[in-house]
């Protein structure tokens, strides 16, 4: 009642960007630095760092520069998902799609129901890409501007998988050295 245009304040600042969230982690080990944009851990680290912003709708993109080639992982999950760690330190669950860049030829874990070998992997200096459509819950992964599996996030086709569950989506990573 009695609300005028002058009574509305534009969200400020605009163009907000997610960083890694040092306050919301699973397990132990790993170090975040450089304004929460860089994460480093030793071999077989099981620390999982989610992003500070979750996506309820729309199309979202994140990229990470891989600076070592040991056992890193990136992924997308339902924000309410409780992560479970399997024997090799991978992250998988009913609402997560994970790319294990450290396995011999790369491996995807999709909602705990399937695993795909020969998924590709980056190397030192590779730009690892993750795209999501929060409305359809589709996920795409890429390396150095090449989408895996002929994926096309712009067209909404050939996704790696569709995240189960229904909550907001978050990006996450497990170190073996990344910088976003």
Q: Language model features by range: what are they?
A:
Residues 1-180:
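PRY/SPRY (B30.2) beta-sandwich protein-interaction domains
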């Amino acid at each position: 009642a009695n609300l005028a245009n002058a009574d509305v304040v534009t969200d400020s600042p605009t163009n907000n960007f997610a960083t890694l969230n040092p306050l919301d982690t699973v397990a132990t080990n790993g170090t975040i630095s450089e304004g929460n944009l860089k994460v480093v851990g030793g071999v077989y680290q099981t620390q999982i760092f989610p992003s500070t912003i979750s996506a309820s709708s729309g199309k979202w993109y994140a990229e990470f520069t891989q600076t070592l080639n040991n056992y890193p992982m990136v992924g997308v999950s339902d924000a309410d998902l409780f992560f479970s760690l399997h024997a090799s330190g991978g992250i998988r669950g009913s609402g997560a799609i994970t790319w294990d860049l450290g396995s011999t030829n790369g491996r995807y874990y999709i909602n705990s129901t399937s695993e795909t070998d020969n998924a590709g992997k980056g190397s030192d200096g590779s730009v690892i890409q993750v795209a999501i459509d929060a409305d359809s819950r589709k996920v795409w992964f890429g390396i150095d501007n090449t989408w895996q599996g002929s994926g096309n996030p712009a067209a909404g086709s050939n996704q790696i998988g569709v995240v189960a569950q229904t909550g907001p989506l978050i990006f996450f990573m497990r170190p073996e050295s990344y910088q976003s």
